[in-house]
């Protein structure tokens, strides 16, 4: 469906940016982009009534939805053009480092590097996208939720993701907690939620970090 196509392109793009931030080789960056494009291809085997259900999935529907990563893997694993690393990244993109993910429930040491990056990108894009069953979160709220998932997401992938994000571009206008509007004049590495701003009314400089 249209959402899955857009989501896959978004996840591929975000994953490649994170991979570059981590210093991966050009070939690894390309491969993780392929992972992003293919990670949800198995959803073509899930009924649209489940994919776009406006309410909460029941247990049987959720069990079927959880099969999509296995379906994706099975659709590409015998294709010569896709490396084992790409196939494993697709299979494991819903695994969590504490073993609470699926389809295999493996923990950090058994999750491939591509999947660790894909997981962060997949969750972020899902959070900021409106779906029939939920509203979209703001980028800031989504980043804060990502930052809270230290027991589930790989720390290195998470840090690289955060370092590559620019939530408040220079010259953008924000509203401060005191109600004053301010212009962003500088972003601070590692503190993406707290830029340096100048109040439009007061002229005061606020270092929100």
Feature map (PLM): residue ranges:
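Histidine- and acidic-residue-rich, metal-dependent catalytic cores
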Residues: 1-209
């Amino acid at each position: 469906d249209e959402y899955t196509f857009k989501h896959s392109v978004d996840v591929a793009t975000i994953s490649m940016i994170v991979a570059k931030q981590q210093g991966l080789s050009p070939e690894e960056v390309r491969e993780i982009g392929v992972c992003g494009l293919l990670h949800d291809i198995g959803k073509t085997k899930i009924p649209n009534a489940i994919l776009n259900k406006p309410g909460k999935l029941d247990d049987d529907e959720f069990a079927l939805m959880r099969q999509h990563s296995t379906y994706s893997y099975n659709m590409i694993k015998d294709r010569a053009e896709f490396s084992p690393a790409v196939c494993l990244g697709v299979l494991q993109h819903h695994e969590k480092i504490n073993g609470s993910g699926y389809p295999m429930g493996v923990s950090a040491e058994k999750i491939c590097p591509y999947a660790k990056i894909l997981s962060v990108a997949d969750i972020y894009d899902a959070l900021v996208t409106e779906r029939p069953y939920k509203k979209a979160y703001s980028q800031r709220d989504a980043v804060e939720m990502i930052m809270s998932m230290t027991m589930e997401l790989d720390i290195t992938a998470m840090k690289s993701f955060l370092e590559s994000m620019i939530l408040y571009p220079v010259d953008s206008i924000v509203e401060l907690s005191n109600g004053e509007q301010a212009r962003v004049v500088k972003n601070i590495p590692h503190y993406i939620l707290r830029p340096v701003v100048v109040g439009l009314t007061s002229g005061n400089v606020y270092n929100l970090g």
